[in-house]
From Swiss-Prot:
Membrane-topology descriptor: Single-pass type III membrane protein
GO MF terms, alphabetically ordered: arachidonate-CoA ligase activity; ATP binding; long-chain fatty acid-CoA ligase activity; very long-chain fatty acid-CoA ligase activity
Regulation: Both triacsin C and rosiglitazone inhibit arachidonoyl-CoA ligase activity.
Extra information: 5 rat isozymes encoded by different genes have been described. ACSL6 corresponds to isozyme 2 (ACS2).
Species this chain originates from: Rattus norvegicus (Rat)
Protein's UniProt keywords contain Magnesium: yes
Name of the featured protein: Long-chain-fatty-acid--CoA ligase 4
The keyword Lyase is assigned to this record: no
InterPro entries: AMP-bd_C_sf (IPR045851), AMP-binding_CS (IPR020845), AMP-dep_synth/lig_dom (IPR000873), ANL_N_sf (IPR042099)
Cofactors that this protein relies on: Mg(2+)
Length: 711
């Protein structure tokens, strides 16, 4: 072994020498050509500061300190005006793109399941003028069907171009749009449609057949269903009195002269634009009421943090458009002339589950420059790439590590490593098309480990944001020059953020070295409250003496000296154990989620017990290999139910917990392995892959009793 190391040291000596020479020759011209000094100064500067010396005062961005921004494009104070501005400016430029489905094949998997595989063609684009024509026709058609201004219309549909066309129609014709996640279960969909009293519903044939058909008898108000696909359905299978139309037929109706001649009833800034139903991570979905002015303000803040946003950019849309992050990102891209190519998590990359082997995924074909991702997706990319690295031979692995560590060191200094990008990371970067210049992360905290990996291997900054549905997605976003990790950036120019003492959790604005407390966001981007839920609105929202709205987030934050915010806890995730210790379940999960053997984890604790337990979705490939090494045989379910495999997972949990310096009482001491992954379709996680703790608790109730010594 010693001889091997000595030989390796000799072999790698030229590599280290090359890096030293490269650094000496390239650094000085690169430093001046890329304006690295200015970028470093930008990264280190104060980005936000409190409005007064009083503890608990709101923090504001230093670039918009005297007043908060409420509008981006002069005169465009409603969403329809943003749309008109974009159409007038970018008329014949490509706008919305969809890939052609060339063929579909059923493929038998080793476990006996049949997966549908797709062979897809190139993207087909419609330009801004064509989008405008479809919006006008669809709006006139809905009006001809009897939909009145300020009457709600719901959309329960997958992310696609028709979703955006329908949304822009509703904004222009002043139809408040009720949005529902396509993965919601029957009970949640029925609740949202009945509570909103929507009489018109936009959906897809697949969702109509698989989810809505069985729920129609429980839905009170829906009289018209519009499906977006170019397919046919058997109307005889649906209740009498329910009118079903294709989107194409509604557009054709609207194009008739007697209908198209009627101008739309335009909205005002104080009109309702959206009632956005949440994913229900903490219970029944709530409808969040957003006025046009709320969304305009929020997007004003978000766009300011994306430098150079414009017609040269291509955005890949695959996250749920019912999620505020995706919706505001796409509207912003449309406004600034960026192409939007539509995708899905199942077709995103060449390795995605619906892409036939040998075919190209959407990123490879589209080559986006901008994309948004939730941490769960970035964690998967990180684990997949690092798994490939582990399969390399010793020299390849060592070379990768040298290059990775070298670039990481440069990034921490605010520099880059172009040679490493070209030689080492080009193939990794190609997984997302090769052209991504910035990624937006939101929906949950991104682990520092994954954040650093994305910076290094994908050669682009990560704009880590913090916002909520209730704040129209706007709160904070890290600047592209800020390469620190574990933080979510300074307040956007549209809002201010203050911290409020939470005595029970031990967080106060007087804490040293930095103030800590519950995060409260204020500004015009704060939504108007919860639909038909005045009690919850009064609990979470407030209005100050100046008429400004504030929202209490329930998240715990810490402000750093440069004005950047760090999310450190969540009130609802805190459990007091029997002996009096407080455990933050989210903190435990974040510390353990990047374990190679773990794909997902949920920590659980009860106040009448003295220890933490966990539910884990193991990595099937790695755990199966480990089972073979340990002589454990059987199916995947058998492996997950094997006590020896549970012990191996617990061993890895302990090692990771110690490395992350978790307290003894925070470390799970029992585990239940789940052979089935947690997906939005199972109802155990949201579309942003946040854990649904209540549903997980109910799902594993018997296991909880067993692990806590019950029957």
């Amino acid at each position: 072994m010693k001889l091997k190391l000595n030989v390796l040291t000799i072999v790698l000596l030229p590599v280290h020498l090359l890096i030293t020479i490269y650094s000496a020759l390239i650094f000085i011209p690169w430093y001046f050509l890329t304006n690295a000094k200015k970028k470093n100064a930008m990264a280190k500067r104060i980005k936000a500061k409190p409005t007064s010396d009083k503890p608990g005062s709101p923090y504001r961005s230093v670039t918009h300190f005297d007043s908060l921004a409420v509008i981006d494009i002069p005169g465009a104070d409603t969403l329809d005006k943003l749309f008109d501005h974009a159409v007038a400016k970018f008329g014949k430029k490509d706008s919305l793109g969809t890939r052609e489905i060339l063929s579909e094949e059923n493929e038998m998997q080793p476990n006996g399941k049949v997966f549908k595989k797709l062979i897809l063609g190139n993207y087909k684009w419609i330009n801004y003028l064509e989008v405008n024509c479809r919006v006008n026709n669809f709006g006139s058609g809905l009006t001809a069907l009897g939909l009145k201004p300020k009457n709600t219309i719901a959309i329960f549909c997958e992310t696609r171009a028709e979703w955006m066309i329908a949304a822009q129609t509703c904004f222009k014709y002043n139809f408040p749009l009720v949005t529902l996640y396509a993965t919601l279960g029957k009970e949640a969909v029925v609740h949202g449609l009945n509570e909103s009293e929507a009489s018109y519903l936009i959906t897809s044939v697949e969702l109509l057949e698989s989810k809505l058909k069985a729920a129609l008898l429980d839905i009170n108000c829906v009289k018209h269903i519009i499906y977006v696909d170019n397919k046919t359905i058997n109307r005889a299978e649906y209740p009498e009195g329910l009118e079903i139309h294709s989107m194409q037929s509604v557009e054709e109706l609207g194009s008739k002269p007697e209908n198209s001649s009627i101008p739309p009833s335009r909205p005002t800034p104080s009109d309702m634009a959206i009632v956005m139903y949440t994913s229900g991570s903490t219970g029944r979905p709530k409808g969040v009421m957003m006025h046009h002015s709320n969304l305009i303000a929020g997007m004003t803040g978000q766009c300011e943090r994306i430098p150079g946003l414009g017609p040269k950019d291509t955005y890949i849309g695959y996250l749920p458009l019912a999620h505020v992050l995706e919706l505001t990102a796409e509207i912003s891209c449309f406004t600034y002339g960026c192409r939007i190519g539509y995708s899905s998590p199942l077709t995103l990359s060449d390795q995605s589950s619906k892409i036939k082997k040998g075919s190209k995924g959407d990123c490879t074909v589209l080559k986006p420059t901008l994309m948004a991702a939730v941490p769960e997706i970035m964690d998967r990319i990180y684990k997949n790439v690092m798994s490939k690295v582990q399969e390399m031979n010793y020299i390849q692995k060592t070379l990768f590590k040298i290059g990775y560590d070298y670039k990481l060191e440069q990034i921490k200094k605010g520099y880059d490593a172009p040679l490493c990008n070209l030689i080492l990371f080009k193939k990794v970067k190609a997984l997302l098309g090769g052209n991504v210049r910035m990624m937006l992360s939101g929906g949950a905290p991104l682990s520092p480990q994954t954040h650093r990996f994305m910076n290094v291997c994908f050669c682009c900054p990560i704009g880590q944001g913090y916002g909520l549905t209730e704040s129209c997605g706007a709160g904070t976003v890290t600047e592209v020059t800020d390469y620190t990790t574990g933080r979510v950036g300074a307040p956007l120019i549209c809002c201010e953020i203050k911290l409020k003492d939470w005595q029970e959790g031990g967080y106060t604005v007087h804490d040293k070295p930095n103030p800590r407390g519950e995060i409260v966001i204020g500004g015009q981007n704060i939504s108007m409250g919860y639909f038909k839920n005045e009690e919850k609105t009064a609990e979470d929202y407030s209005v100050d003496e100046n008429g400004q709205r504030w929202f209490c987030t329930g998240d715990i934050g810490e402000f750093h000296p440069d004005g950047c915010l760090q999310i450190i806890d969540r009130k609802k995730d805190l459990v007091k154990l029997q002996a009096g210790e407080y455990v933050s379940l989210g903190k435990v999960e974040a510390a353990l989620k990047n374990c190679p053997l773990i794909d997902n984890i949920c920590a659980f604790a009860k106040s009448d017990q003295s220890y933490v337990i966990s539910f884990v979705v193991p990595n099937q490939k790695k755990l199966t290999l480990l089972a073979q090494q340990k002589g454990v045989e059987g199916s995947w379910v058998d492996i997950c139910n094997n006590p020896a495999m549970e012990a191996e997972i617990l061993k890895e949990i302990r090692e990771a917990a110690n490395a992350m310096k978790l307290e003894r009482f925070e470390i799970p001491i029992k585990v239940r392995l789940s052979p089935e992954p947690w997906t939005p379709e199972t109802g155990l996680v949201t579309d942003a892959f946040k854990l649904k703790r209540k549903e997980l608790k109910n799902h594993y109730l018997k296991d909880i009793e067993r692990m806590y010594g019950g029957k």
